Curated annotation (Swiss-Prot):
The keyword Repressor does not apply. GO terms for biological process: 'de novo' IMP biosynthetic process. InterPro entries: SAICAR_synt/ADE2_N, SAICAR_synthase_Vibrio-typ. This is Phosphoribosylaminoimidazole-succinocarboxamide synthase. GO terms for cellular component: cytoplasm. PANTHER family: PHOSPHORIBOSYLAMINOIMIDAZOLE-SUCCINOCARBOXAMIDE SYNTHASE. The lineage of its organism: Bacteria, Pseudomonadati, Pseudomonadota, Gammaproteobacteria, Alteromonadales. The gene is purC. Its EC number is 6.3.2.6. Gene3D superfamilies: ATP-grasp fold, B domain, Phosphorylase Kinase, domain 1. It comes from Shewanella piezotolerans (strain WP3 / JCM 13877). Disulfide bonds: none annotated. GO terms for molecular function: ATP binding; phosphoribosylaminoimidazolesuccinocarboxamide synthase activity.
Length: 367
C-alpha cells in the first residue's frame, strides 16, 4: 500500500445510515443519525444525554486547507498523512484535561476510531472565540498600519512583532454572516467587541447575559490549561480559536460546552520555545504552511485579498504541491500530537475500511 492510500481525503461518501444530507466541511464531514439509531446508541452506550437527543458521526479527513482553499500534493498525495489522527488526538487530550480540571464538557460522546467522533447536536454560539497572548499575524499587520483598538480593547504603543502582550486578549469574530445586528457588519469573520455581544445576546445565540462572562472564563481557563501543558514541552501557545455551544444533559439541564476542536495546529499558533528565545520563530502549526504558500507563489496578494477569491481557488486547483511539503506538514502535526499525548500516534493503514468495519461491528450504523 502506497502513501496516498493511507490518507483519508474523501470522507463524505461512507455508507453510514442517515436520513439527512451529509454536511461536508473543509476538513470534517458530519453524518446525522436517524432518530432510531440515535435513541438506540444513547440507551446501549449509556450516553449522558436526553433519550431523544440527535447524534451525529463526525469524520475528520487528512485534507489540508489554508486561505479558504483545500490544497493537494503531487503523486496523488491529496492529503497530509496522519493529520486527521493528530488533530483528533490533540483535541481529545485537551477536552479530557478540561473536564478533569472542572471547566466544561465537550460535544464528544464516544471515539470509535482515531478519525471518528460520535457527537451530540449542539446549538452553537455564533462567535469564533479567539484568545491572543502574543502580537503576530493579522493583529500585527493591523498594528503596523496604526490600529490600536481591537474588538473594543486598546493596546499600548511601542509593541514589537511577536512580543508577548501585557495580558491575554479576547478578540472574538462572527461565526458566519449574521444579519440584522446593529453595528455588526453583515460579513463572515468580522471582529466584534464585548459590547456588541452584550447588545445582541440573542443574535449571537447566548442563552443569557451571564453566559458571556462564562464563555470568556472558559476561554481563558482553557487557554491557560493548554499553555501550561505545552510549556512543559518548551512550546509556546501563541493564540487560538475556540468554539462554544449549548447542549442538554440526560436530566434536561442546559449547559455551555466546548465544541469543534481545541488547541490544535489548525486552530492555534504554537511556537518552539528555544527558538523564540533566540529571536527566531519556528511554527509548530498550520501557520508554517501558510507562510510557505505566501513565499511560494509570486503574487501573494491572491492569498490575502478576499476580492480575488476566484483566482485563489484556481491557484489551489491548478497547483500540486511538492510531496516534501506535505510530509513536512505531517511531521509537524504528528510531532506536536505525540508531545501533547505523551505517546506514539497510531496512523491507520487503511482508514476508510477501518472506519466502516468498526461502525458496522460495534455500532450497527453501516448500510
Amino acid at each position: 500500500m502506497n502513501l496516498a492510500d493511507k490518507v483519508l481525503v474523501v470522507n463524505d461518501n461512507l455508507p453510514i445510515r442517515t436520513d439527512k444530507p451529509v454536511h461536508s466541511g473543509k476538513v470534517r464531514s458530519v453524518y446525522w443519525l436517524t432518530p432510531e439509531d440515535s435513541a438506540r446508541l444513547i440507551k446501549d452506550k449509556g450516553y449522558d444525554v436526553p433519550a431523544d437527543a440527535p447524534l451525529a458521526i463526525m469524520v475528520i479527513s487528512d485534507r489540508i486547507s489554508a486561505f479558504d482553499c483545500v490544497w493537494q500534493g503531487e503523486n496523488g498525495l491529496n492529503g497530509v498523512p496522519g493529520k486527521g489522527t493528530a488533530l483528533n488526538a490533540i483535541s481529545n487530550h485537551w477536552f479530557k484535561l478540561f473536564k478533569e480540571k472542572g471547566l466544561a464538557d465537550s460535544h464528544i460522546l464516544d471515539i470509535p476510531h482515531p478519525l471518528v467522533w460520535i457527537v451530540q447536536k449542539a446549538r452553537p454560539v455564533m462567535i469564533e472565540a479567539i484568545a491572543r497572548q502574543y502580537i503576530t499575524g493579522s493583529m500585527w499587520r493591523s498594528y503596523t498600519k496604526g490600529e490600536r483598538e481591537f474588538c473594543g480593547i486598546t493596546i499600548p504603543e511601542g509593541l514589537e512583532k511577536d512580543q508577548k502582550l501585557p495580558e491575554l486578549l479576547i478578540t472574538p469574530s462572527t461565526k458566519g454572516v449574521l444579519t440584522g445586528l446593529e453595528g455588526v457588519p453583515e460579513a463572515d469573520d468580522v471582529n466584534v467587541s464585548r459590547s456588541d455581544i452584550e447588545r445582541h445576546v440573542d443574535g449571537f445565540n447566548f442563552s443569557s447575559l451571564s453566559d458571556i462572562d462564562l464563555y470568556e472564563k472558559l476561554l481563558k481557563e482553557g487557554f491557560d490549561v493548554i499553555s501550561d501543558a505545552l510549556a512543559e514541552h518548551d512550546q509556546i501557545f501563541v493564540d487560538t480559536k475556540f468554539e462554544f455551544g449549548y447542549v442538554n444533559d440526560a436530566a434536561g439541564n442546559e449547559k455551555l460546552i466546548y465544541m469543534d476542536e481545541v488547541g490544535t495546529p489548525d486552530s492555534s499558533r504554537i511556537w518552539d520555545g528555544s527558538s523564540h528565545r533566540d529571536g527566531k520563530i519556528i511554527e509548530q502549526s498550520k501557520e508554517g504552511f501558510r507562510q510557505w504558500l505566501l513565499n511560494h507563489f509570486p503574487d501573494a496578494d491572491i492569498l490575502l485579498n478576499k476580492n480575488r477569491m476566484e483566482e485563489r481557488f484556481a491557484l489551489a486547483k491548478d497547483n500540486k504541491l511538492p510531496e516534501s511539503v506535505m510530509m513536512d506538514i505531517s511531521n509537524t502535526y504528528v510531532g506536536i500530537a505525540e508531545k501533547v499525548i505523551g505517546e506514539k500516534l497510531h496512523i491507520s493503514e487503511n482508514p476508510k475500511q477501518e472506519i466502516i468495519d468498526i461502525l458496522r461491528s460495534e455500532y450497527q450504523l453501516i448500510v
